[in-house]
Each structure stands twice: as C-alpha cells, then as structure tokens.
Amino acid sequence: ADVITRSDHLHLTAWSFFTDPPRSAARRAASLAHQSGATVSFDPGSFQMIQEMGVATFLATCADLDFDIVLPNKEEGQVLTGSDDPHEIARGVAKIFPGALVVLKLDADGALVLADDDFTHIPPATNKLVDATGAGDSFAGSFLAHHLVHRSPVEAARFATRVAAWVIEHVGARPAPDARLSTLTSTVR
C-alpha cells in the first residue's frame, strides 16, 4: 500500500479484473491511488477475455473506478461499445469512463486521442511490420511515460506511435535496445 500511496500514477490492465483475488487487489490499488492524489490509467487488455466474461460483468467490475486515462485497442473498443467506427468507439469509451482521457490504439492506422471532447488522429510511424507482439503494451507504456512528464496527450501519442513502430520492426515483444530506441526515448526526460 505504501508504494501506491507514494506514487504519482498507477497503471492497471484488465488482466487484473478477470478473477479474484487480483480483481479485489486492483480495485483496492485504484482506490488507494486516487485517495493519495495519484492518477490511474487502464488498458482493457483483451477483447476475448471481455467477451468471455461478458461486457456487462466486465464493466460492473471496473466502471466505477474513475480512471483518468483509458487505452483500449480498436477490438476492445468494438466489444465495449458495439461500434466499428473509431470516433464512435472513443466517444463510447468516454461515456463508459466519464472524465477519462481516451487513447484508442488503431494498429496500422495509428491512434486516436479524445481529450476535452476534441479528436486528434495520430498517423502510424511505420508501415514495416515484422512482428506486432508487444506493440500495444509498448504504446501504452510509452504514452504514459511521456504524458506523465509533459502532460500533452497528443504529443504523448505521437511519441508512443514512434516507440511502437520501433517494436513492430523487430521480432518479439522485448527486442534488444539500440541507438534508435535510445534517441527516441531521450525526449521523455
């Protein structure tokens, strides 16, 4: 609990919400974070797991947690909202999680940021796909690292698309860092 209450931000994924005891721990962590003034972000994590659990049940486990940032991919957004249109998905997610900054990961189409009722499309940073493993997680982590320092969701999404592009141009979810990645990440400090 001390680590959470001393933190500025807590990131949760839906993998924590599918069963107990992780579900109870994640809910408690989000509550502690908010009580201590930290922000909380959420990545729905798996459209298949949401479908298996049932959308209504899934939302009942997390909709009341007042997430500050929600980072679904398009498939997760489709399952949560029933829409195929990225703008409608983002608006639907914003209705599910009122007040949250919504960053919709669009795979080969980049990302869509919905902040303060304004949409900004961020184009993809590459079209050279080698392996998409880890792209969404690298996007989310990069977005949060940049946004929590610079407080610009659009610039954070641009940064995240560049880091995710670097990831998908390599094999595996954790490619070895190189000079290009060092240059990309040096802007976060």
Regions found by a protein language model. Give the residues of each.
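Short amphipathic alpha-helix with an adjacent loop that forms part of the alpha/beta core around
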Residues: A1-T5
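Conserved beta-alpha-beta core of the PfkB/ribokinase-like small-molecule kinase fold
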Residues: H9-G92, D109-G110
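Conserved phosphate-binding/catalytic region of the ribokinase-like
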Residues: S31-Q35, G82-R189
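A short small-residue
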Residues: R6-H9, G141
